[in-house]
């Protein structure tokens, strides 16, 4: 992907982005809705998940939450200041957002504690292998893909 990335308007307005980025968002919309509209999240919101299911979710999700700043650091290593305006934007955003992401591990630990999950249990990761798939995919994407693809894979 060699198209220059230049945002031309507000951050949260899709029309501010290059056509290839707009196409990416449009082509992913069905998949995005399938995830955000998944019954798991509605049941979680409504307090309808069993304690056992919540514990598995919290333990299985820990890997991604704890390592997310590391995925982002892989992408940061791909940037160099002044190579392109888009790369400069990505570099600045990554540096700022890594700091924000660091807090999420603390929040996750507190949430897990509310369900009786200890930090030792989070670290042990004794959950079904399927709960590790997202973490492996994020790590692989950021370690092997070019900047634009890796950032799209983990930050959209």
Role assignments for model-derived ranges:
Residues 25-36, 45-82, 99-100, 148-156:
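Alpha-helical bundle segments that constitute or directly flank the non-heme di-iron/ferroxidase center
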């Amino acid at each position: 992907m060699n198209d220059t990335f230049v945002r031309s308007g507000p951050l949260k307005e899709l029309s501010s982005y290059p056509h290839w980025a707009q196409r990416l968002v449009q082509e992913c919309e069905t998949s995005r809705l399938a995830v955000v509209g998944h019954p798991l999240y509605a049941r979680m919101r409504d307090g309808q998940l069993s304690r056992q299911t919540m514990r598995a979710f919290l333990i299985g999700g820990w890997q991604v939450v704890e390592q997310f700043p590391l995925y982002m650091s892989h992408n940061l290593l791909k940037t160099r200041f002044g190579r392109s305006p888009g790369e400069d934007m990505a570099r600045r955003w990554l540096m700022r957002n890594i700091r924000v992401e660091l807090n999420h591990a603390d929040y996750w630990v507190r949430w897990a504690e509310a369900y009786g999950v200890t930090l030792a249990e989070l670290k042990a990761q004794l959950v079904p292998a399927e709960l590790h798939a997202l973490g492996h995919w994020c790590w692989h994407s950021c370690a092997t893909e070019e900047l634009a693809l890796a950032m799209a894979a983990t930050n959209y």
